[in-house]
């Protein structure tokens, strides 16, 4: 549940069709949609078929000079990504831009200070009147203690300047949960994150039950967040999330629609803050292994989205 109590210099934009905030599950379920990859589907087609209202829009990167652009090359406003946002909002939904990802030039690395990074985040927040942002910190960016601390400090500034905004951090994990480096830095610095979201795939799960492996990793995440922040179990669950990968993963793991049902049941019982996946571009059937446009497993179009769209928080 969110509130909009921003300062006078902010530009908040309500979704078309009213100003009532979404239910607890609506913002929590925002599958990744990537305009730079994999024949991106029409968001309204997915919305109409599944009931999902929100998308996590990938990826905001740096153009090389700490300046945010979509994929580091498409314009921040006025291009295909703004068209997508306008389309989703006109249909009664909204978006959560995701900063980072696996590849490309990351703002978190290219910006020279926390202040510059916070200003880059703010530029995107102001451009679209955002209610939430996702920091997808992976690869070399995650591995750098300097970049981790810069990101934490920048997000503290974003929180101070944008009351009510949701801050999600998405990062990799092992089968027993993630390491505690970034979570510990955030807790020690006084940064509260609405959802620490793990990506429980590409972690050696080929030939194993990925639904059960996901739950094991999520329990490890809960324990790490609980320890760092001094939360109760219930508080920790409510500050964590899962971002799965549908179908055949990059490392040959298989995540089925039934695995998504298992994950959904876990999330419902524990009231996770976020339940998402990579990606709606791939939520289409094909055989012979996953690709950027399909899952590689037996399914009907948008089956994975339909499962997570049932999440109510």
Residue ranges and their predicted role:
Residues 15-24, 313:
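N-terminal low-complexity, Pro/Thr-rich disordered segments
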């Amino acid at each position: 549940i969110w509130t909009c109590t921003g300062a006078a210099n902010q530009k908040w934009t309500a979704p078309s069709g009213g100003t009532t905030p979404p239910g607890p599950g609506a913002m929590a379920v925002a599958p990744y949609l990537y305009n730079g990859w994999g024949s991106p589907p029409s968001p309204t087609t997915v919305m109409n078929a599944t009931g999902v209202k929100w998308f996590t829009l990938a990826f905001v990167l740096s153009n090389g000079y700490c300046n945010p652009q979509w994929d580091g090359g498409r314009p921040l406003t006025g291009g295909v990504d703004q068209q997508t946002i306008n389309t989703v909002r006109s249909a009664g939904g909204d978006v959560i831009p995701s900063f980072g990802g696996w590849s490309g030039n990351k703002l978190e690395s290219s910006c020279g200070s926390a202040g510059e990074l916070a200003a880059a985040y703010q530029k995107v927040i102001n451009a679209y009147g955002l209610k939430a942002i996702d920091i997808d910190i992976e690869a070399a960016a995650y591995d750098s203690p300097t970049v981790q601390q810069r990101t934490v400090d920048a997000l503290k500034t974003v929180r101070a300047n944008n009351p009510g905004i949701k801050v999600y951090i998405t990062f990799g994990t092992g089968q027993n949960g993630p390491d505690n480096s970034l979570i510990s830095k955030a807790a020690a610095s006084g940064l509260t994150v609405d959802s620490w979201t793990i990506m429980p795939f590409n972690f050696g799960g080929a030939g194993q039950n990925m639904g059960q492996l996901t739950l094991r990793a999520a329990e490890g995440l809960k324990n790490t967040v609980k320890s760092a922040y001094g939360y109760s179990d219930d508080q920790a669950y409510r500050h964590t999330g899962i971002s799965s990968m549908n179908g055949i993963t990059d490392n040959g793991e298989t995540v089925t629609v039934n695995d998504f049902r298992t994950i959904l049941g876990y999330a419902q019982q524990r009231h996770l803050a976020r339940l998402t996946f990579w990606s709606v571009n791939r939520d289409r059937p094909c055989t012979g292994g996953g690709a950027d446009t399909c899952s590689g497993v037996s399914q009907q179009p948008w089956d994975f989205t339909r499962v997570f769209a049932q999440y109510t928080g």
